[in-house]
A protein has these predicted regions:
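Conserved DEDDh/DEDDy metal-dependent 3′-5′ exonuclease domain
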Residues: 1-37, 208-335
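Helix-hairpin-helix
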Residues: 83-133
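Charged, flexible boundary elements
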Residues: 121-157
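Flexible loop/turn segments at secondary-structure boundaries
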Residues: 109-111, 121-123, 143, 173-177, ...
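Acidic, Mg2+-coordinating catalytic module of metal-dependent nucleases/exonucleases
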Residues: 4-90, 96-99, 105, 309-383
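Generic, well-ordered alpha-helical scaffold segments in large soluble proteins
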Residues: 101, 105, 116, 171-174, ...
């Protein structure tokens, strides 16, 4: 969508969504950006051979930006540099501009005793407090692995353990895998292809079930979601009693809710207007909101991502589960699903039977299980 002369333009396919590039007005800065890029390219070719990263950057441009995810194939090298520099962009919601303000005050590391959110231009009370807590827990002088010692936030009564709670994570694909066979109409589909669901059984053990699509399709997405609904209903009837309300469904961030909305749209569009049974309203509980609201901070974690939090709890011996080293992460799971789906077309085999998909299932279970262990750890030690 764009607006020109107070008129709004919208489009559904690629040719309808073209927008003008106005070099005489709002887009005139692209000339300067292009010239700057050319100058940088020439400078690197001429001078770059003599630049050094360690012990400190020989030119300002070599300071890494931990928030920039477009670093392939240099991701690991950049991570090492960020770690050794104790770079300020490693901090939660701190980027290039905030670091520049700190550098202007001759502050170059996140553990500098004089670094404050205000120096970085961060004045919002809540954001500033959160940053101070992250810096505090990560200082070498601090011996606590988790702060605060006692968590006040009891949103949704989470501190009181219920007889049954579900811990859920989705694996999904987006529309990037578009072969352009339908161009200019968009191709690819945003789908849930795996639902992992775990809970603590009455005897205290972890119980987990995963629902995986046979192929990437709306019908398979609908099938695994409805099987997951049925599974939660059966477990609730067995552990609680028949016709009891579903218990809390713990998840991490708003992603699951957004993908459920997308799955509902996919289902309705596939039905072509036919009447469908209503999907149940689910008692979602986003534990990330609890972590941010308090805030709960962990030594070694510089933000609130589930992996950063859980890996460092595991490192400190506070939970028992973590991810094994391997090719699977969120992006790897997505690419793996596309690969497996192509194998379905070639072999007629279900994605569920493929080795790579089984690795993704194992990865998904860890996502769910570390949430369970994390919540239990905080209940037992910080409430």
């Amino acid at each position: 969508m764009y607006v020109q002369r107070n008129r709004e333009y919208r489009g559904k396919h690629a040719m309808e969504r073209l927008a003008p590039v106005d070099f005489s007005n709002m887009d005139r800065n692209y000339y300067d950006i292009a010239e700057e890029a050319i100058r940088w390219f020439r400078r690197v070719r001429k001078e770059g051979r003599g630049w050094q990263v360690f012990p400190e950057p020989s030119v300002p441009e070599l300071w890494p930006n931990a928030k920039n995810s477009q670093s392939y194939p240099w991701d690991h090298a950049k991570a090492e540099i960020v770690e050794r520099y104790k770079d300020i962009t490693r901090l939660w919601q701190v980027g290039f501009k905030e670091r520049q303000l700190a550098h202007e005050q001759s502050i170059y590391t996140w553990d500098d005793a004089t670094l404050t959110p205000e120096i970085m231009g961060i004045t919002g009370e809540k954001k500033a407090l959160t940053l101070k807590k992250i810096i505090e827990v990560n200082r070498e002088s601090n011996t606590d692995f988790v702060l605060p010692p006692i968590i006040d936030n009891n949103r949704g009564g989470w501190q009181q353990k219920s007889a049954l709670e579900f811990f859920v994570d989705f694996e999904t694909v987006n529309t990037i895998d578009d072969d352009f066979s339908t161009f200019p109409q968009p191709g690819g589909e945003e789908l849930i292809f795996m639902v992992g669901c775990g809970y603590e059984s009455p005897d205290g053990d972890w119980d987990f079930k995963v629902f995986t699509a046979d192929e990437l399709s709306v019908s398979e997405e609908t099938r695994i979601i409805e099987e997951w609904f049925q599974h939660m209903r059966e477990v609730s009837d067995r552990v609680l009693n028949e016709r009891s309300a579903l218990p809390k469904i713990f998840h991490w961030s708003y992603a699951e809710l957004n993908f459920m909305k997308s799955a509902q749209r996919n289902r309705e569009e596939a039905a072509g207007g036919a009447t469908l049974p209503e999907w149940p309203e689910l008692p979602w509980f986003d534990f990330l909101k609890v972590m941010r609201a308090e805030p709960v901070v962990v030594k070694g974690a510089f933000g609130f991502g589930l992996k950063a939090i859980a890996k460092n709890l595991y490192k400190h011996g506070l939970i028992d589960t973590s991810w094994e080293d391997g090719p699977v992460d969120g992006l790897g799971a997505m690419v793996g699903a596309w690969y497996c789906n192509r194998q379905v077309a070639e072999t007629g085999q279900s994605m569920r039977d493929m080795d790579y998909m089984q690795e993704i299932e194992a990865y998904n279970e860890v996502d769910c299980k570390v949430m369970w262990e994390l919540v239990n750890y905080l209940r037992e030690n910080h409430t």
